[in-house]
């Protein structure tokens, strides 16, 4: 009698196309995200979206802990606890130092309440692929007590702006099947499903 393989929920890849940007902007101009509106359920939180620095390290680790725990609870088959820190100082320093990656943080009066990690993906080596420059939103998380206050939307707007500054053609994000709220969030911003990645336990 053969063992029946169990279907595991999929992850979806979402993308949004970008128009070319008109030249680089300064860190202060990243605060453009402050004026972006969205459909948050609570009163918007006054924030400034800026480039992260290592001075934000402890607050960023707390946010990564929150994000990791969400995934551990929903997908224990894929994510497991590991010794702290949530991300090493060296790893974050590398993201900040490279021209093709960065971390954006949402700063409020009480500190850092959200972050987004952005990575530029190398073009495909496949001759049949249309040349694209893609920025991936590798992580985006808002502190639990500040969700629904338009922080995530303003972070995402700043992420798209950062991508435009670097002449990206698309911004992409992978969303696990369990995270329906995240899927609705990205779709409301204009992202559209591109690839459904299906997996099967062997």
Report residues per predicted region.
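Conserved beta-strand in the GNAT
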Residues: 105, 111-120, 136, 141
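Conserved N-terminal entry element of GNAT/NAT acetyltransferase domains
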Residues: 14-18, 22, 27-58
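Conserved active-site alpha-helix within GNAT-family acetyltransferase domains
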Residues: 153, 165, 177-195
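A short helix-loop-beta-strand connector motif used in the catalytic cores of GNAT acetyltransferases and
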Residues: 90-104, 136
């Amino acid at each position: 009698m053969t063992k029946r393989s169990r279907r595991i929920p999929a992850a979806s890849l979402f993308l949004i196309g970008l128009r070319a940007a008109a030249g680089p902007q300064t860190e202060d101009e990243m605060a453009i995200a402050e004026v972006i509106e969205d459909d948050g359920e609570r009163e918007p939180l006054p924030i400034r979206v800026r480039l992260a620095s290592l001075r934000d390290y402890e607050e960023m680790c707390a946010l990564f802990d929150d994000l990791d725990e969400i995934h551990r609870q929903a997908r224990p088959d894929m994510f497991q606890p590991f010794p702290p820190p949530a991300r090493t100082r060296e790893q974050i320093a590398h993201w900040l130092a490279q021209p093709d990656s960065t971390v954006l943080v949402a700063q409020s009066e009480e500190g850092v309440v959200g972050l987004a990690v952005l990575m530029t993906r190398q073009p495909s080596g496949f001759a049949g692929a249309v040349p694209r420059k893609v920025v991936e939103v590798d992580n985006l998380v808002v502190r639990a007590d500040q969700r629904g206050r338009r922080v995530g939307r303003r972070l995402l707007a700043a992420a798209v702006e950062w991508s435009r500054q670097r002449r990206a053609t698309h911004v992409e994000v992978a969303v696990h099947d369990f995270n329906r709220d995240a899927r609705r969030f990205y779709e409301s911003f204009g992202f559209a499903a591109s690839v459904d990645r299906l997996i099967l336990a062997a």
